[in-house]
């Protein structure tokens, strides 16, 4: 890899790690069992991808993250999202398995950073909208806030993946997005 690629991937990973550290510092205590349970569920959802086109995959992890955002808040959600990027196991077409320990480190770090950054920033948007607009859980406007959360997570996730692919392979962002 070229030095600029390594530098950009390091910066990308560093931002994700900083956001995760911020979540750990600001995390309000929840039972360790709850945290482990949701980490397991998120890792399981990430391990069961749905292929809808060649090399195009979607998982239901976003639904788990929305559930956590509504019930536990941004910091807990980001911790679980980061763990989902690490604790997954996918069986490939040839019968082998893909997991954190047999992928190149830069792919694992990019996936980790992508999940962390998109969950954290989307969670901050959710918190901002709920707090500043004074929207309660029972408000009909909550549907709009949830839609904004989904949209922000989707856009951030896909843009970050496209940027990562641009850094690694040099392919245009628009083509990979």
Predicted regions and their residues:
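Membrane-embedded alpha-helical hairpins and interfacial helices in multi-pass inner-membrane proteins
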Residues: 1-42, 46-63, 71, 75, ...
């Amino acid at each position: 890899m070229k030095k600029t690629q390594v530098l950009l991937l390091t910066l990308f990973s560093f931002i994700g790690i900083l956001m995760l550290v911020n979540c750990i510092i600001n995390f309000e205590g929840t039972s360790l069992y709850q945290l482990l349970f949701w980490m397991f569920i998120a890792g399981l959802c990430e391990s069961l991808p749905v292929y809808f086109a060649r090399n195009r995959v979607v998982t239901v992890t976003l639904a788990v993250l929305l559930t956590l955002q509504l019930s536990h808040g941004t910091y807990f959600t980001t911790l679980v999202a980061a763990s989902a990027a690490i604790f997954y196991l996918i069986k490939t077409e040839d019968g082998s398995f893909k997991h954190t320990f047999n992928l190149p480190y830069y792919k694992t770090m990019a996936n980790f950073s992508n999940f962390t950054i998109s969950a954290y920033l989307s969670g901050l948007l959710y918190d901002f909208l709920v707090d500043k607009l004074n929207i309660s859980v029972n408000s009909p406007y909550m549907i709009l806030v949830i839609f904004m959360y989904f949209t922000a997570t989707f856009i951030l996730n896909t843009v970050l993946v496209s940027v990562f692919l641009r850094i690694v392979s040099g392919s245009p962002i628009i083509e990979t997005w």
